[in-house]
Structures are given as C-alpha cells and as structure tokens.
Amino acid sequence: MKKLFVVIICAIMALSVSAQRASSSSSEKAESGVRFGIRAGLNLSTLSLVEDNHTYTTDSRAAWHVGAIVDIPLMQSLYVQSGLYFMNKGGKESEGEAKVTYSPMYLEIPVLASYRYDFGSAAQLQINVGPYFAYGVGGKEKMEYDGEEESDDFFHEDSAKKFDCGLQFGAGVTFASHYYLGFAYDLGLSNIAKNSGDSDGKIKNRSWMISLGYTF
C-alpha cells in the first residue's frame, strides 16, 4: 500500500510541474498557477445494501474528513483538482433493541474536473465532478444489544473489501482568493462486500460532505 501512495503522490507532483510549465507558455492558461490547500469538514454517510434482491439504505452517520488538495490549471476557467483525504464514512442500522454502527476509515484521492467562475475579485464559484479512489485503513463494526457491546474490524477477512471507487460531485466558493466553503457527494460504485458462495450481497458507500478550507 505504501508503494501505491508513493506512486500516486509522485504522479500528482509530476502533473503539477507539467501544468506549471504549460501555464507559463500559453495565454489561454489560468494565470494563478498551481495552488495547494487544506480542507476539513463533516460527512453525513450511509451504506447502500442489497441482500436477497432487496435494496435498502442504512440510517445516516455523522463523521468527518481532513485532507490536502492541489489545483492544477488547464485552461482559462478549467482546472484539475486532486488531493489526499482521510475520510470517515459508514452508517447505522437498528432493529428493536439491536443497533449496529459501521465506521470505516479511508484514504481517498479524488481526481476532479473543476470549472471556475469569478464574481469579480471577491469570490470564485467552482463546480467539480470526477472519480474518486479510496483504500480502507481501519474502522469498526460495533454491535449493541441489551446493554452489551461487541465490536470487530470493519475490514475483517469475511466482511468488506478495502478498495473503493466511485464518482464525486460538488460545488464550492472561494472567498478573497483563499477561504473555501464547499459541498460534495460521494457516490460509491464499487461493491465492497466480500461475497462467498452464492451470496448476492452488495455494499456501496454514500456520503454527503461539507468542507471548510484555506488555499495558499
């Protein structure tokens, strides 16, 4: 896993250098150049489940995320935005006195096409869409019943796959060239359930996010 993230980070850095060179050689490129930033915020996450041909969604679970981003200009008003996030997702289920809380944690890399529109010098709107790739690094599956608690690793060998990918849609506003407020939605497309035998079970991540940030 370490080798994978080293390769990804090197690729992002290479894209940054390439974009900087391109932006200096064409009048059509964005003038601001490559920029970096930090992001943090809250998630409202659920799991979409299919079991015995029946589809349902867990109750939502409040969680959080934190990470760093890179903005790479391609053309005027068009950027690629990527980064690396530590993302907490999951959901909740309850039936009678029994409750189950899922809290998987991921390292997540979005690769987004980002359209920008300036409202003078005061604010800039951005609309983002693109794939995300995530790898599970921890988390628990906690069960509560009749006052008793029991927990297990979310990614134990018979439960969930660590790799996840999907689409991210989002929008945000940058104020005074630095301060960011944004919203996004992660639509998981990978079935992260570890099926065995004839099981047709499916589990997919869903997550709404609100982020605050600072762009350098």
Task: Show which residues each predicted segment covers.
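Residues that define the transmembrane beta-barrel architecture of outer-membrane proteins
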Residues: 32-34, 60-64, 103-109, 123, ...
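Glycine- and aromatic-enriched membrane insertion/assembly motifs of diderm outer-membrane
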Residues: 35, 55-99
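Repeated loop/turn-to-beta-strand initiation elements of outer-membrane beta-barrel proteins
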Residues: 78-80, 177-183
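Transmembrane beta-strands of outer-membrane beta-barrel pores
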Residues: 42-46, 86-90, 108, 117, ...
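Flexible, solvent-exposed loop segments that connect beta-strands
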Residues: 46-58, 88-105, 137-162, 191-203, ...
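Outer-membrane beta-barrel "beta-signal"
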Residues: 173-174, 204-216
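Outer-membrane beta-barrel channels and translocator barrels
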Residues: 31, 75, 87, 118-122, ...
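Short glycine/proline- and aromatic-enriched beta-strand/turn motifs that initiate or cap beta-hairpins
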Residues: 20-63, 124, 215-216
